[in-house]
């Protein structure tokens, strides 16, 4: 029926993207979501025969949630690295004095480890579950993958906020080695 979802592959010369609006990020770098109008035409052979629900459940759900979580972990790890550099530089400027951000740095390192462990647990769950196509389509597996995504996305916001607190204005500026 016309409401069924299908998965289709398009080659570069078979589609066009027309930008419809520009996203105003209000200072939030990395959140660009410009709007586009997608137009495409291709032979029917490029439509996957398998129902989209099966494709999504058996590969797309886990792959996208785990990939997003891993990317977010990388973003958070970079922010923590910059915060570490900031604290290290502060310690060098004032030997013998614990920099104010040192305690927050310990806290944020623990949070980063939590995200990493979450992603690894999700990867292991997927590796085990993908052996059984029925299990991949189960509600339990979908909840597990959603939990990986939600947990990762929520914790990295806290990590970024901690890194910004550690680096202060130098973390907000775009042209410093501590830019978050």
Regions of interest found by a model, annotated:
Residues 1-17:
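A short core secondary-structure module
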Residues 12-14, 18, 55, 167:
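Residue-level signal for pocket-adjacent positions within structured domains
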Residues 20-24:
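Short beta-alpha junctions and helix-cap segments that line functional grooves
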Residues 25-113:
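Glycine-rich beta->alpha junctions and the first turn(s) of the following alpha-helix
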Residues 69, 76, 83, 108, ...:
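Amphipathic alpha-helices that form helix-helix packing interfaces
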Residues 84, 88, 127, 164, ...:
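Hydrophobic/aromatic-lined pockets within catalytic cores
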Residues 87-146:
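A beta-strand-loop signature enriched in Asp, Gly, Thr, and Trp
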Residues 169-180:
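Glycine-rich phosphate/cofactor-binding loops in nucleotide/flavin-utilizing enzymes
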